[in-house]
Amino acid sequence: MNLVSEKEFLDLPLVSVAEIVRCRGPKVSVFPFDGTRRWFHLECNPQYDDYQQAALRQSIRILKMLFEHGIETVISPIFSDDLLDRGDRYIVQALEGMALLANDEEILSFYKEHEVHVLFYGDYKKRLPSTAQGAAVVKSFDDLTISTSSNTEHRLCFGVFGNDAAESVAQFSISWNETHGKPPTRREIIEGYYGEYVDKADMFIGFGRFSTFDFPLLSSGKTSLYFTVAPSYYMTETTLRRILYDHIYLRHFRPKPDYSAMSADQLNVLRNRYRAQPDRVFGVGCVHDGIWFAEG
């Protein structure tokens, strides 16, 4: 692989970056939209602006950016069990936001324009139908998956209660064994959970605290983890390209170093780098006004 500098990569035309990404990865990226209400209160006027519409526009902007940079499949967790602790009012607002994903004209046009097949995963079919509003959302999800099934350029998997797949996988495996007389393969389990087979995640782009979540069965030791300092809606093309550059050129496609073949000078540089910062830890943070920030 010809190694270009980060500056050269940042300056490449979009079509060139997309070609590199399609050829060399990443194919599957996890991008949860996190810190969205914080962004809204900082960048919008809560008295006049509508949170749902503002969030939807930003989500479309970022999804468009990811797809236009050559990423084929985006996994986007949008609602987890822990959000239930925020109360009934938040849940109602969340349901309204979820409904927009399947009904809003702007995002439907986005799916069509970018040839996006939309799928939903998680325990939403068990958890949402307890109310009429929730049942309507589930139906709209199913209808959207069917109506976009002919789109083959990109895939977008929204996670709703997708934090733990253990029970779903167990029930699916029992049913599969009863029907086919044998346990399902890994591929069949993933198809059953996500609606289609999805490769293991190449990278996860989170915000704030260093933790991954809500993409069951797809994590591996080769999943590159990235965490932005600012909430997800602050994502820029420069930020994304820096992440792509690191993933493609710096992490996985270089030969493993042979320490026995290193010169004394090379070993000294490495030793001095480690000795200069033995107490530095990525993931350690501080709290200001009740908000956690990364340090290090």
Swiss-Prot record:
Gene Ontology BP annotations: diterpenoid biosynthetic process; tuberculosinol biosynthetic process
Enzyme superclass (EC): transferase
Effect listed in the UniProt record for changing Y90F: Decrease in TOH production and almost loss of iso-TOH production. Almost loss of TOH and TOH production
Q: Name one GO molecular function term.
A: transferase activity, transferring alkyl or aryl (other than methyl) groups
Describe cofactor binding as the record notes it: Can also use Fe(2+), Cu(2+), Mn(2+), Zn(2+) and Ni(2+).
Reactions it catalyzes: tuberculosinyl diphosphate + adenosine + H(+) = 1-tuberculosinyladenosine + diphosphate; tuberculosinyl diphosphate + H2O = tuberculosinol + diphosphate; tuberculosinyl diphosphate + H2O = (13R)-edaxadiene + diphosphate; tuberculosinyl diphosphate + H2O = (13S)-edaxadiene + diphosphate
Source organism superkingdom: Bacteria
Membrane-spanning residues: none
Phenotype on deletion?
Deletion of the gene abolishes 1-TbAd biosynthesis and decreases the formation of swollen phagosomes.
The effect annotated for D82N is: Significant decrease in phosphatase activity. Loss of phosphatase activity
Q: What is its EC number?
A: 2.5.1.153
Cofactor(s) it depends on: Mg(2+)
Q: How does activity depend on temperature?
A: Optimum temperature is 45 degrees Celsius. No activity is detected above 50 degrees Celsius.
Activity regulation (UniProt) = Inhibited by the bisphosphonate inhibitor BPH-629.
User: What does the entry report about how pH modulates activity?
Assistant: Optimum pH is 7. It is active in a pH range of 5.5-9.0.
Q: Which UniProt keywords apply?
A: Transferase, Virulence
Subunit composition and interactions: Homodimer.
Q: What does this protein do?
A: Tuberculosinyl transferase that catalyzes the condensation of adenosine and tuberculosinyl diphosphate (TbPP) to generate 1-tuberculosinyladenosine (1-TbAd), which acts as an antiacid that directly protects M.tuberculosis from acid pH and physically remodels M.tuberculosis phagolysosomes. In addition, acts as a phosphatase that catalyzes the diphosphate-removal from TbPP to produce both tuberculosinol (TOH) and isotuberculosinol (iso-TOH). Has broad substrate specificity, and can also use the 3 labdadienyl diphosphates, copalyl diphosphate (CDP), ent-CDP and syn-CDP in vitro.
Q: What other comment is given for this protein? A: 1-TbAd is highly prevalent among patient-derived M.tuberculosis strains, where it is among the most abundant lipids produced.
Family per record:
Belongs to the diterpene synthase family.
State the name under which the record lists this protein. Tuberculosinyl adenosine transferase
